[in-house]
């Protein structure tokens, strides 16, 4: 699934002749495996329906948003989400917000569906945390190497 998602993401970002369709075929295969409708069928009743892939590609297109959402869902417990968000440079959108979760102390289905805001605060320091520090030993070996900003 990760290869199909990466392929779909690359095709959508490339946004050239036929690549949007190729990428969405891979994404729809993942959705089909999970028993879900295709992207077009799922989004046809939305406020801004997707009736054609053309015009929805590129880094800021609707298809990019969809493939990112699918990636977060499909790779949920594989510890990939944190790295994807950093790679997409969306730390402020996903990390510097209140943490929400389920009410796990509930005794019925209605209680579980209640969203709780947790007191924990996650701080993501942008742009610093988009990069990792280069180990000091490596920087000292090469006088031409410069440490990443703010480290």
Describe each model-derived feature in a short phrase:
Residues 2-151:
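Acidic/polar-rich alpha-helix caps and helix-coil junctions
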